[in-house]
Design a protein with these regions (language model features):
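Phosphate-ester processing/binding pockets and catalytic centers
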Residues: 1-185
Length: 185
């Protein structure tokens, strides 16, 4: 996909697909990195989203995510609650355990690194769930199916992390019953 988007660019595979940068270049025409200037053209953006969609379908990639309605959370659970990010992580891990069980599989978690100390609460919650289990799964089940959590930087150029970068906004629009930004994705 990168070779197609940056045709003729010797550095094409080193460029990182980053939704925020691509959207900024497309909307404002500005970018901190010159490699994103190709996304000033709507046609290139549509080509990107069509390519991402094709990759997901062609390789039968399962995507999952979590949406936390902040207003409903505050209304239903007034007072002090756990941070939304750790709530979402627990919900995601429970669904991931379910997915792994039904596919007779094991897996690891690769999470996009946040600016420190942002990773620490997530890492702590992961270890708590590993030690205590979840609402649905025992610690043994969790430890048997999920290996470890790793926080990777965007600059590591990991294909899966770049693909995952485009999922949350699409899922949030769907959860909010809004039309997708890109018809093909």
């Amino acid at each position: 996909l990168k070779l197609s988007l940056w045709a003729g660019d010797q550095q094409a595979t080193t460029h990182i697909l980053h939704e925020k940068e691509i959207t900024e270049a497309n909307k404002s025409g500005r970018s901190n990195d010159p490699c994103y200037t190709i996304f000033r053209a709507n046609g290139t953006v549509e080509k990107l989203y069509a390519g991402l969609s094709k990759l997901i379908k062609m390789h039968s990639i399962t995507t999952m995510g979590v949406c936390v309605n902040s207003d409903e959370l505050s209304r239903l659970y007034p007072g002090e609650t756990n941070p939304k990010l750790t709530i979402a992580l627990q919900m995601l891990l429970e669904n991931y355990c379910h997915f792994l069980k039904h596919n007779t599989a094991t897996g690891d978690i690769c999470y996009e690194s946040l600016q420190e100390p942002g990773n620490q609460p997530l890492r702590q919650r992961f270890y708590e769930l590993e030690a205590l289990g979840t609402m649905y799964y025992t610690p043994h089940f969790f430890q048997t199916h999920i290996g470890d959590i790793e926080f990777c930087g965007k600059n590591e150029n990991l294909a899966g992390l770049q693909l995952a970068d485009f999922i949350p906004n699409t899922m949030a629009r769907s959860a909010a019953r809004m039309p997708p930004k890109h018809d093909s994705f």
